[in-house]
Amino acid sequence: MTAAAVFGCTGAVGSQILATLLASDAFSSVATVSRKLPTAESPKLQAIEEGDTSKWGTTIASLSPKPSVVFNAVGTTRAAAGGIQNQWKIDHDLCIEIAKAAKEAGVKTYVFISSGGTRGFLSRHVPYSKMKIGVEDAIKELGFEHAIILRPGMIIGREKSKAPLFEAIVGHLNKLGQGVQDRIGQDQLIIGRAAVAAARLAEDGKAPSKFWAVEMSDIVRLGRDEWKE
């Protein structure tokens, strides 16, 4: 069985990753590092509360057992961070720091929750996309045994919506056909399950490539259509 660590465990996708890991027999222990403790409980959960995000990365090397897989679902909004510069410190700088620390600690599989459309025609001119591109490129350069980048569309099913109107619209697109919704947004549960499923494939030596970008269609396939408990 595998040991895992999760960063961003209290967010929409991160909480689903955590719940999925705790319910899976494939993972023997799960550690989390966050500003506030997750609500989930389990005998195999080691939850670390650390308000100073600059210390997050260094905790990886001290975890016991040492995680083979690290999931990073850290993310915020410009409004919540108090401006684009502060958002950059979290969504870009902190995420790269965690990835570097994971590599130094000997983590084999690194899973990062990015965003769909980050490699589009105009994406390099959009601050949010530039953050995600920077993190993706840094992870690739670190040379993990397996690096997995999930690029979901709009996240739906959240308790606290970041874009209530748009999320509500996307959330009802399945009435026009599930495929219509799948091409635009995915439920947080499906994204979380897809992240864990991809990590399990990598750990079993079944990932399609060393650097695997999991796009929306694969997220739906792994997290819903082919999902097995």
Swiss-Prot record:
Gene3D superfamilies: NAD(P)-binding Rossmann-like Domain (3.40.50.720). Disulfide bonds: none annotated. It comes from the Eukaryota. GO terms for cellular component: mitochondrial outer membrane. The keyword Mitochondrion applies. Coiled coil: none annotated. InterPro entries: NAD(P)-bd_dom, NAD(P)-bd_dom_sf. It is found in: Mitochondrion outer membrane. One of its GO terms (biological process) is import into nucleus. Residues 1-44 form a transit peptide. The keyword Nucleotide-binding does not apply. It is a peripheral membrane protein. Keywords: Membrane, Mitochondrion, Mitochondrion outer membrane, Transit peptide. Belongs to the FMP52 family. This is Protein fmp52-2, mitochondrial. It comes from Aspergillus terreus (strain NIH 2624 / FGSC A1156).
